[in-house]
């Protein structure tokens, strides 16, 4: 019942319009089902080899979010069912997702991962790389279409950005990171017409029912600050499921 209690507590702090992604990586299916019985449907996993058996065994109305580093050779295993890939950190990965999605004729939702934290170990486009793609599409190599728009990647639905704050207890540093992520998200523009249109209104365009980019930021320690700074999607694990003592 602890998971039920934890979710109820967290829900009191999450406003309408912010999606709670329950980060279930390294946690057993029984724990996921307890959260599911509370009404949760969005779950986050970071390893393909762990996600696949969970997808096969658990209810099919679960929306699976892939939040970890994704190797290009594993993309084809999750594109048939994944709800959203949060961790697109390179044009090469975006190209692979588009190619595999086209094979099965299924558009895949993604977020572009941006790196604003102080740790060099974190992945993602640097702010400079992100803004370069947004503002200078003509400088990109024509033989390998790298401008992040619907015309280049018709089978990828760019929904927004994802990022992480520096691993610190300093709230001011959290805010710096979250404001930087939200600022980068503001450089995304909605599609010119329908979500299926191949004409984008900017080099980096997103397709979102709410006509605003999704901003996936905030975890167990800092999600309240992230929400204050504009997060539309928080990824919470240990505060729901407890700390993981060992990997599955």
Task: Label every PLM stretch briefly.
Residues 232-233:
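Divalent-metal-activated hydrolytic enzyme cores
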Residues 1-142, 146-192, 206-221, 229, ...:
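Conserved alpha/beta-domain cores
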């Amino acid at each position: 019942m602890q998971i039920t209690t934890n979710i109820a507590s967290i829900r009191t702090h999450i406003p309408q319009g912010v999606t709670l992604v329950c980060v279930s990586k390294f946690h057993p299916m029984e724990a996921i089902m307890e959260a599911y019985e509370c009404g949760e449907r969005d779950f986050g996993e970071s390893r393909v080899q762990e996600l696949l058996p969970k997808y096969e065994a658990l209810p099919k109305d679960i929306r699976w979010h892939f939040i970890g580093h994704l190797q290009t050779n594993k993309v084809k295993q999750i594109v048939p069912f994944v709800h959203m890939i949060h961790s697109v950190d390179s044009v090469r990965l975006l190209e692979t997702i588009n190619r595999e999605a086209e094979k099965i004729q299924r558009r895949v939702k993604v977020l572009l991962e941006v790196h604003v934290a102080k740790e060099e170990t974190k992945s993602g486009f640097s702010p400079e790389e992100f803004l370069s793609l947004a503002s200078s599409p003509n400088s990109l190599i024509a033989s390998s279409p790298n401008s992040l728009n619907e015309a280049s990647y018709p089978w990828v639905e760019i929904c927004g950005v994802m990022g992480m704050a520096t691993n610190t207890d300093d709230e001011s540093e959290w805010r710096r990171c979250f404001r930087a992520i939200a600022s980068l998200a503001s450089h995304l523009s909605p599609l010119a017409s329908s979500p299926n249109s191949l004409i984008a209104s900017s080099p980096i365009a997103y397709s979102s029912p709410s006509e605003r980019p999704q901003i996936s930021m905030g975890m167990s320690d800092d999600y309240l600050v992230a929400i204050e700074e504009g997060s539309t999607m928080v990824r919470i694990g240990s505060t729901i499921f407890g700390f993981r003592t060992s990997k599955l």
